[in-house]
Amino acid sequence: MTQVYNFSAGPAMLPVEVLRRAEQELRNWHGLGTSVMEISHRSKEFMQVAEESEKDLRDLLQIPANYKVLFCHGGARAQFAAVPLNLLGDRNSADYIDGGYWAHSAIKEAQKYCTPNVIDVTTHDNGLTGIQPMKQWKLSDNAAYVHYCPNETIDGVAINEQPDFGNKVVVADYSSSILSRPIDISRYGVIYAGAQKNIGPAGLTLVIVREDLLGKAHTALPSILDYKVLADNDSMFNTPPTFAWYLSGLVFKWLKEQGGLCEMEKRNQAKAELLYGAIDRTGFYRNQVAITNRSWMNVPFQMADASLDKLFLREAEAQGLQALKGHRVAGGMRASIYNAMPIEGVKALTDFMADFERRHG
């Protein structure tokens, strides 16, 4: 059987070691004679899963004690509404950094609840999209918080700087880059991330929130999105997505076994450099993002002759290189190379790209 590598932007590839373990214990989890999917979320066995997964995540990200970790439903789109309704308080404005598709989607949702101060930080020089340095962002004085998306999956644009905005509350959508490298949690008020890219399977959403921000929710906010309600109930206000939570916990253990986030940073940089090197080598392929803002997680690329796209994708699929079609908004190709993608998968892709260019260039 051909080795398959899944380059999907999400739901994305999971570590093979995690899948093997889940397969082994699927029908008889911890000797109970049932699957983890079938046991009560309030059972002592699942409570152990919840406690261990939070501890492992705190260890990986070095989450300070004054932050709550919430395991939620709804994906990042639910958080687009939850953030303003939890954090605005008596204010009517927040700073929203517009750096791409997902940042703009958060802005559109926030407009239902407040008047966002939209700050476009994109640059366009010589056909390349980039992001202004954070020191140039024109933040307002009266904003309840500053919201931005560090990694745009569709455009392949990354903001690699860590925020340093004094006492401003910083909110970040880390859905596509969480756990890919170390970050300083103390610089943020809220971090949220859909699980289906770099954490685990779809259905789980991670929220990390500083404790002093709890208890300010709008009265019309549904309880299931209220950070304080979720924190007070240890993410068990209603039945959580238990299987996704369990699998994410296995991913956290796998990450620790691999050497933690410093090791993942090295691996992710090596994978990205290999792929961008193949794209830049001759001009047959091209990436339209400024080098300083190229994403390590999502690498879009095009060919000068777009008529070859369908052939490229068909031949790649036949070689076991799956889900390389670009987002419908951007077209072209896109390789998502999250933590679970081994460098062997990127090498297989770059070898195929070189061979395709040799035959069609």
From Swiss-Prot:
Positions that bind L-glutamate: R42
Sites bearing N6-(pyridoxal phosphate)lysine, chain numbering: K197
GO molecular function: O-phospho-L-serine:2-oxoglutarate aminotransferase activity; pyridoxal phosphate binding
Cofactor note: Binds 1 pyridoxal phosphate per subunit.
Pathway where it operates: Amino-acid biosynthesis; L-serine biosynthesis; L-serine from 3-phospho-D-glycerate: step 2/3; Cofactor biosynthesis; pyridoxine 5'-phosphate biosynthesis; pyridoxine 5'-phosphate from D-erythrose 4-phosphate: step 3/5
InterPro entries on file: Aminotrans_V_dom, Aminotrans_V_PyrdxlP_BS, Pser_aminoTfrase, PyrdxlP-dep_Trfase, PyrdxlP-dep_Trfase_major, PyrdxlP-dep_Trfase_small
Superkingdom: Bacteria
Catalytic reaction(s) noted: O-phospho-L-serine + 2-oxoglutarate = 3-phosphooxypyruvate + L-glutamate; 4-(phosphooxy)-L-threonine + 2-oxoglutarate = (R)-3-hydroxy-2-oxo-4-phosphooxybutanoate + L-glutamate
Cofactor(s) needed for function: pyridoxal 5'-phosphate
One Gene Ontology cellular component: cytoplasm
Keywords: Amino-acid biosynthesis, Aminotransferase, Cytoplasm, Pyridoxal phosphate, Pyridoxine biosynthesis, Serine biosynthesis, Transferase
Localisation per UniProt entry: Cytoplasm
EC number(s) per entry: 2.6.1.52
GO biological process: one example: L-serine biosynthetic process
Binding-site list for pyridoxal 5'-phosphate: A76, R77, W102, T153, D173, Q196, N238, T239
Self-association state and partner proteins as the record states: Homodimer.
Family: Belongs to the class-V pyridoxal-phosphate-dependent aminotransferase family. SerC subfamily.
Function: Catalyzes the reversible conversion of 3-phosphohydroxypyruvate to phosphoserine and of 3-hydroxy-2-oxo-4-phosphonooxybutanoate to phosphohydroxythreonine.
Protein name stated in the entry: Phosphoserine aminotransferase
Gene symbol of the encoding locus: serC
